Amino acid sequence: GMDVDKLDFLIEQDYEGVIIEGTGLGHMPISAFDEETEHHTEIQEKLEELTEDTVVAMTSNCIHGRVDMDVYDNQVKVKNRGVIKAEDMHPELSYVKLMWSLGQASDKEEAENIFQENYNGEILKRSEYHG
C-alpha cells in the first residue's frame, strides 16, 4: 500500500523521477472517508509536494492495463497533483522510458513531454482486448 512515510522518503531522496504502480486504470489510495482512511488526505499533500520537482508517472499493475486518469474522481485528484500517466506501458518499460526521458531533457517539463510521446510503438493508441 501507499503511506505517507514512503512519500516522505521519496521527497527526501530528491529523485528526478518516480514510477507509481497503481491498480486497474491507475488507482492509488487518496480519498479520506473514515478514520481508517483519514491519512489519505496527507498522501494527497505529499504527492503534490513530490511532483513539484520530480517527474511522477502512474502505471498499472495489470498485464494489459492502461492508465486513464480522467475516469474516476481519485484519478483526477492524482492528475491534478501533477502525476502524469504512463498510458499502456508496463511498469518496467515505464521505468526505462522515464530514465531515458530524464537523460534527454533539460528540465522536468521537457522530461514529462518526452515520457508521454510515442517514439517507437511503446504507447499504443488503443489497448487490445485479450478476453
Name these PLM-found stretches.
Residues G1-I20:
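C-terminal and late-domain segments of enzyme folds
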Residues I11, I20-G131:
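Active-site catalytic microenvironments in core metabolic enzymes, especially phosphate/sugar-handling
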